[in-house]
Design a protein with these regions (language model features):
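Acidic (Asp/Glu)-rich catalytic clusters
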Residues: 32-38, 59-82, 98-113, 157-160, ...
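Conserved, mostly hydrophobic/aromatic
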Residues: 42, 115, 201, 231, ...
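C-terminal helical cap(s) of enzyme catalytic domains, especially alpha/beta-barrels
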Residues: 283-307
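Active-site-proximal loop/turn and secondary-structure-junction residues that shape catalytic pockets
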Residues: 28, 46-50, 66-68, 86-88, ...
Length: 309
């Protein structure tokens, strides 16, 4: 049976309070140097540490020297988890097994506590190119054909990685026609078929609830919460009447409310990760990052007061 890597920091999912982590960005370097103990783990985006020369090239991938040296230094002091952005596991026309093998190679190198990706499509077939990168995660219609497709790909991915894959719920700004089941029913069926885990992004869910007009709490009630291994929390902002998943600094109160309501119900929750875009670091500041970590700990273990500044 596929297992997570055991960690002296994170332990085994479901055996104690969830760990508190940060999505790494360059603006965090100073804080992590001064306070390496402020976070239990770091989540990294592997694709930002290597160069992809394209499917026709051999060798196709090469580590970026400066970025990889930084990652090696981070790995000396922090437990790492991987959060991929390029797999495009739900693309109907293409599936990139070389990308999976590259991720597996990095898993062997860094022994990620777990690996996650997005339940989405970023690559599509167009008239101009059979493998066009859309530049953003595209929304999906939840149907049985897609379930069959993604189930097969998740199984192959987990076999190559040698570990369980977590899949993250995405962002939708407008209704998507063509579904014959709910997103939660789709995810629950995928978990049953493949044994994969769930990365529940609470801010993504809030974005969808605001823009599409549904109740986020009721949405969560329909999800198999025993499959949730990681959660993401983040902030956003409004633009032209639409609420965006912009990772714009501190989390809104609605995200904290969802975390406090949901985390105790997730029996296998291993970690909660705060993510923000580094362009918002001047406004958030290091104290702001520490405050977000404090609030995460308070939500997970209410008797925790704060992290010393």
């Amino acid at each position: 049976m596929l297992q997570f890597s055991e960690s002296p920091i994170l332990g085994i999912p479901g055996t104690g309070p969830a760990a508190v982590g940060l999505m790494f960005n360059g603006a965090l370097a100073g804080l992590l140097d001064a306070r390496p103990d402020c976070t239990d783990f770091l989540s990294i985006i592997p694709e930002r540490f290597w160069q992809d020369f394209g499917r026709s090239q051999r060798p196709r991938f090469a580590p970026l020297p400066d970025e990889t040296a930084l990652l090696d230094r981070l790995a000396e002091r922090h437990r790492l988890v991987a959060h991929g952005v390029g797999l495009s596991i739900a693309s109907g026309s293409t599936f990139d097994l070389d990308h999976v093998r590259q991720l597996a190679e990095w898993h062997r190198r860094y022994d990620f506590a777990w690996i996650s990706e997005h339940l989405s499509a970023v690559r599509v077939r167009t008239e101009e190119t059979p493998d066009h990168h859309a530049g953003l995660a595209l929304p999906l219609a939840w149907d049985h054909d897609l379930l069959d497709l993604v189930s097969e790909r998740v199984a192959r991915t987990q076999d190559i990685l040698g570990t369980r894959l977590l899949l993250e719920n995405g962002v939708v700004h407008t209704p998507v026609p063509g579904s014959d089941m709910s997103e939660q029913d789709f995810v629950n069926a995928l978990v049953r078929r493949t044994g994969c885990g769930v990365l529940l992004d609470l801010h993504n869910l809030l974005v969808n609830a605001i823009n599409l007009g549904f109740d986020a709490g009721r949405w969560i009630d329909g999800l198999d919460l025993a499959a949730v291994v990681e959660m993401h929390v983040a902030g956003g902002n409004r633009l032209f009447g639409v609420y965006l998943d912009s990772h714009a600094g501190a989390c809104p109160q609605s995200v904290w409310d969802l975390l406090a309501r949901t985390a105790p119900r997730c029996s296998n929750l291993a970690g909660v990760t705060f993510e923000y875009h580094e362009s918002y670091h001047p406004a958030l500041g290091e104290d702001g990052v520490l405050d977000q970590l404090d609030r995460m700990r308070q939500a997970l273990v209410p008797e925790v007061v704060h992290v010393d500044r």
